[in-house]
Regions:
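Terminal low-complexity tails and localization/encapsulation signals of metabolic enzymes
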Residues: 2-58, 91, 95, 145-171, ...
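Residue-level signal for inorganic ion chemistry
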Residues: 53, 89, 111, 133, ...
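Glycine-rich loop-to-alpha-helix module at the N-terminal edge of alpha/beta enzyme cores
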Residues: 54-144, 154
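Conserved small-residue-rich beta-alpha loop and adjacent elements
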Residues: 146-220
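A structured beta-alpha segment of the ubiquitous adenosine-cofactor-binding alpha/beta core
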Residues: 156-157, 224-246
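Short beta->alpha connector loops at strand-helix junctions that form conserved
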Residues: 192, 197-199, 227, 248, ...
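Active-site pre-lysine segment of PLP-dependent enzymes
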Residues: 206-215, 230-241, 252-263, 279-287
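ALDH superfamily catalytic-core signature
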Residues: 252-311
Length: 311
């Protein structure tokens, strides 16, 4: 009886702990007007740690009202941000670059926990995104216009690069830091505002990047984050206040976004699924070649544009 009592107690504690953990799983917030906001969503997606299957966070399927609020916030912020000195925007990117470097390990750990790639690969994910932020710091040369004097009598031509307005980005799950960093830093430094929809499967890195962006001094509303699936993508493609969309991901989603967005008069860049070619030369080391090709099939579960796909 005593042994059974002990076993029962252990089982009870075990089930009790599991129930407690389940009820206290953190939720992924929205980022609207410079604040991390709890969603009022009725539908949520569980994000699992691929190594342990533990639920690490719950991601909301945002209702339309919250997505509208994010776009309205970006639109309101555009008025002042687009008129901010280009040197001020550049200094903000310098500060942001420094903060990402300091928090690289934290970002990598979040990626590994949610997405599953190794810490080394996760740090590479952050580093490649950081390089784009560094490029954004050269905005003073990126924003140069053009001039052509004397094209006719008493006539010169000058062209200027001006911000578009509210831009949006839809990013995939395989590079949770790198691909968002391909998008919003360049949009911001050129005077645009931004609405980001990260992958609902691993949004943690994007939320940390928002925290660092706020610390870098970017004004409230300049960048906003929403969460969701197909409905959120359609919302971005159809909202009249969103002027441009950047997408990286699968062929099916990319074609949908390109067709739907351009039909509504938006500038769309759609980087769809791709793979590298592999050419095996006659003098190649066969063992090394097989190891490399086999390795590619498992990196990021095979979903990486750089790898060679075997069919």
């Amino acid at each position: 009886m005593e042994i059974r009592g002990i076993l029962f107690k252990r089982l009870f504690l075990s089930f009790g702990q599991r129930a407690f953990v389940t009820s206290t799983v953190p939720t992924t917030k929205l980022f609207i007007n410079g604040k991390f906001v709890e969603s009022s969503a009725s539908k949520w997606i569980d994000v699992h740690n691929p190594a342990t299957n533990e639920v690490v966070t719950r991601v909301p399927i945002c209702p339309k009202e919250e997505m509208e609020e994010a776009v309205a916030s970006a639109k309101a912020a555009f008025k002042s941000w687009s008129n901010t000195s280009i040197l001020t925007r550049q200094q903000t990117m310098f500060h942001y670059q420094s903060l990402i470097k300091k928090n690289m390990k934290r970002l990598a750990e979040s990626i590994t926990e949610e997405q599953g790639k190794t810490l080394v690969d996760a740090e590479g994910d952050v580093f490649r995104g950081l390089q784009v932020v560094e490029h954004a710091c050269s905005v003073t040369s990126l924003q140069l216009g053009e001039s052509l004097p004397s094209i006719a009598q008493n006539m010169d031509i000058h062209s200027y690069r001006i911000p578009l307005g509210v831009c949006a980005g839809v990013t995939p799950f395989n590079f949770p830091a790198m691909i968002p960093l391909w998008m919003f830093p360049l949009a911001l430094v050129c005077g645009n505002t931004f609405v980001l929809k990260p992958s609902e499967r691993d949004p943690g890195a994007s939320m940390i990047l928002m925290e660092l962006l706020k610390e870098a001094g970017v004004p409230d509303g300049v960048v906003n984050v929403i969460h969701g699936q197909h409905e959120a993508v359609t919302f971005i493609c159809e909202h009249p206040d969103i002027k441009a969309i950047s997408f990286v991901g699968s062929d099916q989603a990319g074609k949908y976004i390109y067709e739907r967005g351009s039909k509504n008069g938006k500038r769309v860049q759609s980087n769809m699924g791709a793979k590298n070619h592999g050419v095996v030369m006659p003098d190649a080391n066969k063992e090394h070649t097989l190891n490399q090709v086999s390795r590619d099939q498992f990196l990021t579960t095979g979903l990486w544009m750089k790898i060679t796909q075997v069919e």
